[in-house]
Amino acid sequence: MKILYISVECFPFIKTGGLGDVAYSFPKTLKKLGNDIKVFLIYSDSISEKYKEKMRSAYFFSLDLNGKSFPVEIFSLVMDDIEYLFFNDPSFKNIERTAYLDLHENSTFYLIFNKAISKFLELSAFKPEIIHANDWHTGILPLFLSGEKNENSKLKVVFTIHNLQYQGVFGASNVLKYLNEKERSNSLLSEIISNDIFNFMKAGIISSDIVTTVSETYKEEIKQPMQGMGLESVLNKYNSKLRGIINGLDYDIFNPSIDKYIEAKYDVSNYKEAKLINKIALQKELNLEQNKKIFLIGMISRLANQKGIDLVLNSLWNIVKDNDIQFVVLGTGDVNYESNLKSFGNKYPRNFKFINKFSDELSHKLYAGLDAFLIPSLFEPCGLTQLISLKYGCIPIARATGGLIDTITSYNDKQENANGFLFKEYTPEALYKSVKLAKNLFYNNKPEWNKLIYFGMDQRFGWEEIAKKYLESIYK
């Protein structure tokens, strides 16, 4: 099957969130399963020189829109048998191209990005059967492909919602002025535009053939007002084309048996001694008391409201006050959250450590050395960190939302094959209660604790299983 996969970020070129991991691992797996796939991305000056040096100019053309000419160059790089295509328009050189920007002036940039994809499809000998677009940045693309779909009835556009919070909302006039007559006459525009607002995410939902979300629970949650972010009525209307499939984990990258960053490698058959070695090594590196018996918990997170950082700040004192826990947070984000975490770390250095950066190497060491991993998200479409922590025998303590519900079987509920802890209420008290329950089990019932580790490590959330679901139930 021929597939064009479109994203604004992709590891190792540019990555600001979980989409970057998905856009690397998912196409790689589809390729391994025998599919012909290309990945369409955005060029950025921040891409490492070692990749830029391998790029070649594949296409150069101008897009003439509303009396203005936009020069477009598409670079090509082949890596691991996959061609990566990078859109570049030098007239937008000063725009910071990240997945979470939703700035007014960027409506034109993302419109040109999608127009360039449409033009590429005209020029290229590569004729995909599936176009898989991701998040709001690509939401307008199905409108531009109406002509392609008329000529090629086999062409199907799949649109994936990774995070409904970011929608690409712009003044309609700023978008419409760059559409041609055929595009402006599309009957779907009257439904997409509301109160002179053009919503790219809404456009993707309405105009694509199938809409997927990144977990079954999140699919249901976004049809409700609390998490629908204003689009719940649209999602309910188009419920028949809505699907929920969790993201996978790339075991070539996240696998304690081959992890180059950790002190002692291990798998489900020999984790006990290795995890203690990794724990002591982590404590030493972070200048914490080297104590293999203490309960060591942590977080790796973007410091944003979505991630439940306010709950953590309001629970910290209760969590560490008894001096029987070490707590580590690794992440960057909201400056107020950073400041408060730094302040707490300065007051209680014996029990709490805040590392105000992101480090891929250190994150691997945390997964291998921590006893438990905290994920107190307000909402979590899928979640990647719980999948990694499970693989590394690091017990997740998470709020019951989105993909966390779909991947964590809670010990609280006394379920068989439990692999973690879930709490329902979004309150500091509920978070603390769940941490306390986990701590008590860790200290007082090691056989039960080790069962959680075993069941977590023994589960499979690999991309091959997920890719087969897409091939069998979405793409075909």
UniProtKB/Swiss-Prot annotation:
Pfam families per UniProt: Glyco_transf_5, Glycos_transf_1
Single GO term (MF): alpha-1,4-glucan glucosyltransferase (ADP-glucose donor) activity
Keyword tags: Glycogen biosynthesis, Glycosyltransferase, Transferase
Pathway named in the protein's UniProt entry: Glycan biosynthesis; glycogen biosynthesis
Binding-site positions, ADP-alpha-D-glucose: K15
GO biological process, one term: glycogen biosynthetic process
Enzyme Commission designation: 2.4.1.21
Residues making up the signal peptide according to the UniProt record: none
Leading EC class: transferase
Catalytic activity, as annotated: [(1->4)-alpha-D-glucosyl](n) + ADP-alpha-D-glucose = [(1->4)-alpha-D-glucosyl](n+1) + ADP + H(+)
Disulfide bonds: none
InterPro entries assigned: Glyco_trans_1, GS/SS, Starch_synth_cat_dom
Family statement drawn from the similarity comment of this UniProt entry: Belongs to the glycosyltransferase 1 family. Bacterial/plant glycogen synthase subfamily.
PANTHER family (alphabetical): ALPHA AMYLASE DOMAIN-CONTAINING PROTEIN (PTHR45825:SF11), GRANULE-BOUND STARCH SYNTHASE 1, CHLOROPLASTIC/AMYLOPLASTIC (PTHR45825)
UniProt function note: Synthesizes alpha-1,4-glucan chains using ADP-glucose.
The protein's name: Glycogen synthase
Protein species of origin: Mycoplasma mobile (strain ATCC 43663 / 163K / NCTC 11711)
Name of the coding gene: glgA
